[in-house]
Swiss-Prot record:
Protein keywords: DNA recombination, DNA-binding, Transcription, Transcription regulation, Translation regulation
GO biological process: DNA recombination; positive regulation of metabolic process; regulation of DNA-templated transcription; regulation of translation
Function: This protein is one of the two subunits of integration host factor, a specific DNA-binding protein that functions in genetic recombination as well as in transcriptional and translational control.
Superkingdom of the source species: Bacteria
Any one GO MF annotation of this record: structural constituent of chromatin
Complex and partners: Heterodimer of an alpha and a beta chain.
GO cellular component terms given for this protein: cytosol
Record family assignment: Belongs to the bacterial histone-like protein family.
Identification of the protein by name: Integration host factor subunit alpha
Amino acid sequence: MALTKADMTETLYQELGLNKREAKEIVEMFFEDIRCALEQGEAVKLSGFGNFELRDKGERPGRNPKTGEEIPITARRVVTFRPGQKLKARVEAYAGGKQ
């Protein structure tokens, strides 16, 4: 199961007493702010959660799996996420209890 924006909206609706339209707008604005910051080349740092950063990947050789032909994979910019220590600790504690 995955957490969705609809789930987040529902949680804001139930826990904070916002109406569904307001809750949906807050969730959408949150993600739009993250998108805008990343589009402008800024890192996004969410204390206690983690960091979203941009990383430039250089061109590298690739291979067509069907033909075996070498094909260059073009340079590109990707978004990476690095979890913070608090998030890591909570995930590890939860995962440790499930084993």
